[in-house]
Each structure stands twice: as structure tokens, then as C-alpha cells.
Amino acid sequence: IGSLFRMADAFGIEKLILCGGDIALGRKTAKTARATEKIVNYDIRESATEVVESLKKQGYQIISLEITTTSKPIHNFKFLKNQPIALIIGDENFGISETILYSSNHIIHIDMYGQNSSMNVVQATNIALYEITKQIL
């Protein structure tokens, strides 16, 4: 989680919303975050589904980063500049729930060419935020 704070700061993310019932921001997080947890706007919420629905009502594009049978490669996806983006990233072990995938406006993935079928959530998020930033700035 600390790495997510550092990355959110690096890319100028408006807000980091962490969802789940067992999220602790302890010493390990603070050490990895290198004090960015003190400057990045964040919230901890129980229900990811409620957060996604609220963001949709506020006009955000809900874009989930997950490999599915219908996801589009991120390098072929065109991010809209005139609508705020909520990038949804999943749990390291379980990914993004089917409910949230169904609620998403778009599902994108990062093409992989090695033997492994997935990559670390933080590294995938870094790649996605780089691509989004490259396109919209």
C-alpha cells in the first residue's frame, strides 16, 4: 500500500480510495510510502461497489485494470480527456470482483509476453498511470 501512495504522489492522483475491511496503515506502509501518505488525499471505505457506483454518478469513467476475455490492451485504448477517470485496481490475490467489472465503463489490460499470467498490482498500476498520463496531458 505504501508504494501506491508514492505512485499516487508521483502521478498527481486526485485521490486514492482504498476499499476493504482489513486495511491498516501501519509502520511498514509509512516506511514504504516515504511520507507520501501524509500528502496524498486518501480515503478508506468498506465497500468497493458503493464507491464505484458513487463515482459513476459523479460522472467518472470507471476503467478497470484486469485481464478478462473482453478486456482491451491498454496501448490500444483511448482515454477521454474531458471526463474524470477512476482507475480500478484489484486485490493482489483475487483481482476485481465480477460486480465491479460489470459496472465498469471499460476493462483494460497490459499485454504480457512471458510465462507468468499476471503482474504485481503496483507495477501494473504504474504502467497504467503512465499510459493515462501520456495520453491526457
Where are these regions (language model features)?
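Post-transcriptional modification and biogenesis factors for structured RNAs
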Residues: 1-137
